[in-house]
């Protein structure tokens, strides 16, 4: 399976780029999984549902299944994230896109940057950043694209990464 991490400062366009890449790959019949890093606690389940009651009773894993969707909720015992486990959960995908995960050196990264954020480039301080998507006109020491080059970005990611 091919993997890539899309990183960048808040409001740089990461989610927009990931969504556009997913649409591009879907048209090409490439099965894409996305793992989104959340910096805050979240809950996809709701009180007064059977699954919520089961999970709150102490189930380590609760899986909801319908004819159209599957959701797995796993209670984390430790705060660390096991990259291998996330990859295993998505092993039926052709490409796995991680949104965030900039501290994971083993992932090849694509940085999304916009001038108006007035932030420095992450590739200067983060390991394994191979691509940059930006709206500036500067020369950079890594392969650079503009935000509208979705087909070129998608092709480069899929053809070069493994």
Question: Language-model features: where?
Answer:
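N-terminal phosphate/diphosphate-binding loop that engages ATP/GTP or pyrophosphate donors
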Residues: 22-77
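Hydrophobic anchor at the beta1->P-loop junction of P-loop NTPases
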Residues: 6
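The conserved Walker
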Residues: 10
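Conserved lysine of the Walker
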Residues: 14
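Phosphate/Mg2+-binding loops and adjacent switch elements
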Residues: 95-162
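Phosphate-binding/switch loop-helix module in NTP-utilizing enzymes
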Residues: 74-104
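Walker A (P-loop) ATP-phosphate-binding motif of ABC ATPase nucleotide-binding domains
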Residues: 3
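Post-Walker A alpha-helix
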Residues: 17-18
């Amino acid at each position: 399976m091919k993997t890539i991490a899309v990183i960048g400062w808040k409001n740089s366009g990461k989610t927009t780029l990931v969504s556009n890449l997913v649409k591009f790959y879907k048209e090409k019949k490439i099965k894409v999984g996305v793992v989104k890093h959340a910096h805050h606690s979240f809950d996809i389940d709701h009180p007064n549902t059977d699954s919520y009651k089961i999970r709150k009773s102490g189930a380590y894993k609760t899986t909801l299944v319908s004819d159209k969707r599957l959701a797995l909720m796993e209670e984390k015992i430790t705060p660390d994230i096991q990259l291998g486990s996330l990859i295993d959960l998505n092993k039926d995908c052709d490409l796995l896109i991680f949104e965030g995960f900039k501290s994971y050196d083993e992932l090849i990264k694509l940085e999304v940057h916009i001038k108006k954020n007035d932030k420095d480039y992450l590739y200067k301080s983060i390991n394994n950043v191979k691509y940059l998507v930006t709206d500036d006109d500067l020369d950079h020491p890594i392969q650079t694209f503009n935000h509208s080059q979705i087909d070129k970005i998608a092709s480069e990611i899929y053809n070069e990464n493994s």
